[in-house]
């Protein structure tokens, strides 16, 4: 059978199996086993265990459970609430200070936890009631936190970037740096829209800040600064080449766990057990998807599907930006239905030869891909962040949360357009700090 036709058959079968309710990892294994057995015989099928475990035999993968534990330690404390409170007190005189504080807190907590749902929950519990109390529109209150939570997969340290780096064999440290300026761009766009939307809907009074004494401003800092110093240290170790991502993540997790115990008195063994249990579950889920995606990629390569698609794309007489438009549409649709890790592991091995062949920078593309995945986090039918916000603020209808999030989707699309027009936003800082990339 022609590899391109076989590729369409694989895609259709994968969609059918994943929509049947089976987990992503098991679905990828089932599809891989079916097609290897049908078109390559038992010889390839027997190699599945070797590929499965071989994919996990990677030192860089150790950073995933460590960063997850680091985020869980922070999320198990009041660090998010304290961070929000600190920014609110210090930025109260800034125009639209509260919404700026919320989004700033989302960005910083995302850098500390690396988790979008955790960011939504931690900042939303404090931010949404306070914004409603100060007469911010419900759509702005819910939408800004839902959108701010998505920054967890872009702003370093990001599990999504680690997975992309492993899937495409690119530098994880460089990927982290590539996400910094685009992350700040997104935060700026989110802030601009939030302030404009509040002003447009007549919420002028909501933009006026409260007054805090210097004592009130300084008393909250001792609970926040230690965590921020850990994050700065982690990023310095990564960017400065002091340690590998896995080593840095392990030290960061240990320090955050220690700070949670010392500062927030998290000494209850039950709480620590729940934190370790949930971190382990999330880590195993991601690692299982990575292993299954390795088998899926092996199947695509063994049946010459990946190579045939790349060759076919290369023969098309199409402008490379038109090609990028099609890729963005594909990623956007995939992000509506699948978690970011699954999309990256399934799509990156196929798309990377196409991206390189078209002359695009793989680190710039990582940012584009991640922003597309962010859109999926606040878009139905999955829209995980929407449901997190609905869970912590049930008095706000889900429809209001969704409509309030749509302008932030537009902000992300604008960010993608800006990055396409000015790719240096994603590539300048990595080139400055780590030298020119070799692709």
Predicted regions and their residues:
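Alpha-helical transmembrane segments of multi-pass membrane transport proteins
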Residues: 1-439
């Amino acid at each position: 059978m022609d590899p391109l036709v076989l590729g369409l058959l694989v895609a259709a079968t994968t969609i059918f199996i994943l929509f049947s309710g089976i987990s992503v990892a098991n679905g990828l294994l089932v599809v891989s086993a079916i097609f290897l057995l049908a078109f390559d015989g038992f010889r390839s099928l027997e190699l599945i265990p070797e590929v499965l475990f071989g994919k996990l035999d990677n030192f860089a993968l150790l950073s995933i459970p460590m960063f997850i534990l680091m985020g869980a330690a922070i999320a198990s404390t009041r660090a998010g609430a304290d961070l929000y409170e600190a920014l609110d007190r210090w930025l109260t005189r800034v125009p639209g200070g509260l919404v700026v504080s919320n989004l700033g807190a989302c960005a910083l907590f995302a850098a500390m936890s690396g988790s979008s749902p955790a960011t939504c929950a931690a900042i939303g519990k404090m931010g949404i009631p306070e914004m409603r109390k100060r007469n911010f529109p419900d759509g702005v209150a819910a939408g800004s936190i839902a959108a701010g939570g998505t920054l967890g997969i872009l702003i370093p340290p990001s599990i999504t970037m680690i997975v992309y780096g492993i899937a495409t064999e690119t530098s994880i440290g460089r990927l982290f740096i590539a996400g910094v300026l685009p992350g700040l761009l997104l935060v700026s766009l989110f802030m601009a829209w939030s302030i404009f939307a509040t002003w447009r809907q007549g919420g002028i009074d909501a933009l006026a800040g409260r007054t805090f004494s210097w004592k009130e401003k300084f008393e909250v800092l001792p609970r926040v600064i230690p965590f921020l110093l850990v994050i700065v240290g982690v990023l310095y170790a990564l960017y400065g080449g002091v340690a590998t991502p896995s080593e840095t993540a392990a030290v960061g997790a240990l320090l955050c766990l220690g700070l949670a115990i010392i500062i927030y008195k998290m000494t209850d063994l039950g709480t620590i057990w729940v934190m370790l249990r949930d971190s382990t579950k999330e880590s195993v889920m991601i690692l299982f998807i990575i292993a299954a995606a390795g088998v899926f990629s092996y199947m695509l390569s063994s049946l010459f599907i990946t190579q045939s698609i790349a060759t076919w794309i290369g023969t098309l007489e199409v402008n490379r930006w038109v090609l990028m438009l099609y890729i963005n549409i594909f990623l956007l649709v995939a992000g509506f239905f699948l978690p970011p890790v699954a999309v990256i592991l399934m799509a990156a091995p196929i798309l990377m030869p196409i991206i390189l062949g078209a002359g695009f920078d793989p680190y710039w593309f990582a940012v584009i891909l991640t922003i597309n995945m962010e859109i999926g986090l606040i878009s139905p039918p999955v829209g995980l962040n929407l449901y997190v916000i609905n869970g912590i603020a049930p008095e706000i209808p889900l429809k209001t949360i969704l409509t309030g999030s749509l302008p932030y989707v537009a902000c992300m699309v604008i960010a993608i357009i800006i990055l396409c027009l000015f790719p240096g936003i994603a590539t300048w800082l990595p080139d400055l700090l780590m030298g020119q990339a070799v692709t």
